[in-house]
């Protein structure tokens, strides 16, 4: 049955307008993004099949261009639209963070860092640079690859912080394995960076390790 034959209140677009996006299922939200189905399938039917094919909404959103475009009903145009939506979401979080008078909420910082790093396929080490009022100056990605004491250079971290006149920093990196629990090398490099930054009077407020479903805070663990 075509969606146009459904009761008006059950059609995804009308349901969203009347009840809010939160009231829709993953399949209904995806159907609105798809706009149309394929021969013999409504947009909602196609959306359900795609969610089953990818294993859920998140794997679909994080799929590579090649994997995404191989699925029925998808292609480069939809992939481009999706990437634009995801990037707007990340920029929205960044803008919201910039507007805060100070970054005193670990939850807000976790949400921002997770949006930036959780989807990355390789490890990325980044800095959140803050001024004397703990306001955001800039989010900077510094290193890519295996993050350990041999690949993260304290000199580059200090240089970047000084070049932006940062008074404090929050360290962040992701674990592509999906497990956010910090490793011993994570703890070792945090200590090295904290010591290097102290030499130039720059405070290290936290180190966040991002996994699939959570971000672990060194500060909350009492390690900083």
UniProtKB/Swiss-Prot annotation:
Note whether Transmembrane occurs among the keywords: no
Q: What PROSITE patterns does the database record attribute to this sequence?
A: MPN (PS50249), UPF0758 (PS01302)
The alphabetized list of GO BP terms reads: proteolysis
- Motif JAMM motif covers 173-186
Q: Which InterPro entries match?
A: MPN, RadC_JAB, RuvA_2-like, UPF0758, UPF0758_CS, UPF0758_N
The positions annotated for binding Zn(2+) are 173, 175, 186
Q: Which UniProt keywords apply?
A: Hydrolase, Metal-binding, Metalloprotease, Protease, Zinc
Give this protein's Gene Ontology molecular function annotations.
metal ion binding; metallopeptidase activity
Please report the stretch or stretches of sequence annotated as the MPN domain.
102-224
- What's a Pfam family in this record? RadC
Q: Which family does it belong to?
A: Belongs to the UPF0758 family.
Q: Which NCBIfam families match?
A: PRK00024.1, radc
Name by which UniProt lists this protein: UPF0758 protein Sde_3678
UniProt source species: Saccharophagus degradans (strain 2-40 / ATCC 43961 / DSM 17024)
């Amino acid at each position: 049955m075509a969606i146009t034959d459904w009761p008006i209140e059950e059609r995804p677009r009308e349901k969203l307008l009347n009840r809010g996006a939160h009231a829709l299922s993953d399949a209904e939200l995806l159907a609105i993004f798809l706009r149309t189905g394929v021969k013999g399938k409504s947009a909602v039917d196609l959306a359900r099949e795609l969610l089953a094919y990818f294993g859920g909404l998140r794997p679909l959103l994080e799929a590579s261009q090649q994997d995404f475009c191989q699925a029925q009903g998808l292609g480069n145009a939809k992939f481009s639209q999706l990437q634009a939506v995801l990037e707007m979401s990340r920029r929205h979080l960044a803008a919201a963070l910039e507007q805060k008078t100070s970054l005193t909420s670990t939850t807000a910082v976790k949400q921002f860092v997770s949006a930036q790093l959780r989807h990355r396929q390789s490890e990325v080490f980044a800095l959140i640079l803050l001024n004397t009022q703990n306001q955001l100056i800039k989010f900077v990605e510094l290193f890519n690859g295996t993050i350990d004491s041999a690949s993260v250079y304290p000199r580059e971290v200090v240089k970047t912080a000084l070049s932006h006149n940062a008074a404090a920093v929050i360290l962040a990196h992701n674990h592509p394995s999906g497990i956010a629990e910090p490793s011993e090398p994570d703890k070792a490099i945090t200590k090295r960076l904290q010591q290097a930054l102290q030499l130039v009077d720059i405070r290290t407020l936290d180190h966040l390790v991002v996994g699939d479903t959570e971000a672990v805070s060194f500060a909350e663990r009492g390690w900083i």
